[in-house]
């Protein structure tokens, strides 16, 4: 069953919009000289976002001696980077938290996977002290956004018994629809006016050798994605069908021993995120 790109994009158009408060706050945070009081004022009008920043600021992770009771206090404690990450993670949770039976994924699985890829890719960049840690985080968070419009179509495909035993969902997407979720996700990114480096990382995170530019970012997302698959985080029945690109490891100068460290770091961070975003990711 071949479908047009426009049909798939229309399906993507059904995704819920980003809350206005989150949009405005993220816009403010892009300014390096942002007044966090303005950010607090924007977040204070959104009950869910307010509760998230207060919950994180009062967590044992920050270990404050007294209780944070206002959104203004919370954003001052957290800082712009933590607030930004929380807003993006919360928003994407709304997209990726639903069950995706077409991919054999329960509720929350794809979201957990996306968060792990984002954190893992950023950890790789931070450890190497490379610029672009924010961008690689966003690329990891959005790398599988193309699965959402595909999922409904996959449910309608009559797959012969045992067909999944010999291939991946990626291969099945190409076979049945002529495009895969990575390329569709990149097209969604273009429609959302994402930066070129994010679009490239989304498009090539399964085949990093094909990336025409931003190769280190693509490689970091690819390796972090592979780490999540090794952990069994947010993968379907085809989880072992994907091959880790050794050239990507070489490009990153990534030692095998680092994989264990990456997995350990990401496991702790996912657990922390679960504590504060559970009401945004049903099914956890």
Question: Where would I find each of the regions flagged by the language model?
Answer:
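Terminal helices and disordered tails flanking the catalytic cores of nucleotide-processing hydrolases
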Residues: 1-7, 246-284
């Amino acid at each position: 069953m071949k479908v047009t790109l426009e049909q798939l994009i229309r399906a993507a158009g059904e995704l819920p919009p980003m809350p206005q408060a989150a949009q405005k706050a993220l816009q403010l945070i892009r300014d390096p000289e942002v007044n966090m009081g303005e950010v607090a004022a924007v977040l204070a009008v959104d009950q869910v976002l307010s509760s998230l920043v207060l919950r994180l600021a009062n967590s044992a992770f920050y270990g404050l001696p007294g209780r944070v009771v206002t959104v203004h206090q919370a954003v001052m404690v957290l800082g712009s980077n933590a607030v930004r990450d929380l807003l993006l993670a919360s928003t994407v949770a709304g997209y990726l938290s639903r069950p995706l039976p077409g991919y054999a994924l329960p509720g929350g699985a794809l979201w957990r996977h996306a968060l792990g890829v984002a954190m893992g890719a950023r950890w790789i960049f931070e450890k190497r002290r490379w610029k672009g840690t924010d961008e690689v985080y966003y690329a990891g968070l959005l790398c599988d956004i193309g699965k959402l419009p595909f999922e409904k179509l996959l449910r309608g495909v009559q797959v012969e018994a045992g067909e999944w035993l010999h291939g991946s969902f990626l291969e099945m997407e190409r076979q049945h629809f002529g495009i895969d979720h990575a390329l569709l996700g990149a097209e969604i990114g273009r429609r959302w006016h994402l930066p070129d480096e994010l679009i490239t990382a989304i498009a090539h995170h399964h085949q990093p050798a094909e990336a025409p530019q931003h190769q280190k970012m693509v490689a970091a997302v690819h390796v972090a994605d592979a780490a999540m698959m090794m952990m069994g985080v947010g993968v379907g029945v085809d989880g072992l069908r994907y091959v880790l690109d050794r050239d990507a490891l070489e490009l990153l100068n990534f030692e095998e021993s680092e994989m264990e460290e990456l997995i350990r770091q990401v496991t702790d961070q996912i657990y922390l995120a679960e504590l504060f975003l559970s009401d945004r990711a049903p099914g956890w």
